[in-house]
């Protein structure tokens, strides 16, 4: 979502997909199934660019929307298993729901794409520091750990990562500004 991204770096996945026109808008009353799976759906946007979808990432609020999807006979598409948790997948590709607050549903409800085209690398050495004395504080200022009193050690590791979204030439969509291995589903009213 381009959060704290250096200005000299390339755009993130959501911005890249938006600039390429790989956006499907889910308005109130729209059929979610069609917005994902139909010819004008999010998966089709990626396939039009010559890529196969191999994964989906969505805001945790999408779980309820997907649980509510029913087939033409009224049966839920995503069935719960009493012994195992429901594994979500769309069109055979796994779906993940980050629950750490990092997914910004105001920008995208779901990101689908060819995640093999999203690469990252360590751009600077990882540095480590071992502490045997000191305190670890909570955000309110209270002390969570006093290393010396509790006979503890703390390890601090700092690493810097960089990312890239390769956009190799293909004959499916020759205009590189319109070709994108990712598409997003966003909430709102269509601008068409």
Where are the regions a protein language model picked out?
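Alpha-helical scaffold segments that mediate packing/assembly in large oligomeric complexes
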Residues: 1-44, 89, 96, 178, ...
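Extended alpha-helical or coil "stalk/linker/tether" regions that are enriched in polar/charged
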Residues: 27, 33-58, 65-83, 89, ...
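Long, contiguous amphipathic alpha-helices that act as assembly "spine/axial" helices in icosahedral shell
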Residues: 1-18, 45-57, 61-62, 95, ...
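Sequence/fold signature of self-assembling virion shell proteins
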Residues: 72-192
């Amino acid at each position: 979502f381009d959060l704290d991204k250096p200005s000299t770096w390339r755009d993130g996945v959501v911005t890249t997909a938006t600039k390429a026109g790989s956006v499907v808008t889910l308005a109130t009353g729209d059929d979610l199934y069609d917005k994902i799976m139909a010819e004008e759906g999010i998966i089709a946007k990626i396939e039009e660019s010559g890529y196969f979808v191999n994964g989906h990432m969505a805001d945790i609020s999408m779980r309820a929307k997907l649980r509510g999807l029913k087939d033409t006979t009224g049966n839920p598409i995503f069935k719960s298993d009493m012994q195992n948790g429901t594994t979500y997948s769309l069109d055979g590709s796994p779906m993940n729901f980050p629950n750490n607050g990092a997914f910004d549903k105001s920008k995208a409800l779901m990101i689908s794409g060819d995640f093999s085209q999203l690469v990252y690398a360590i751009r600077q050495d990882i540095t480590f520091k071992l502490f045997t004395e000191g305190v670890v504080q909570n955000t309110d200022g209270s002390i969570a750990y006093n290393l010396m009193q509790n006979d503890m050690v703390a390890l601090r590791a700092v690493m810097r990562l960089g990312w890239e979204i390769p956009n190799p030439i293909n004959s499916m969509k020759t205009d590189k500004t319109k070709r994108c291995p990712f598409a997003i589903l966003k909430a709102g009213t269509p601008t068409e």
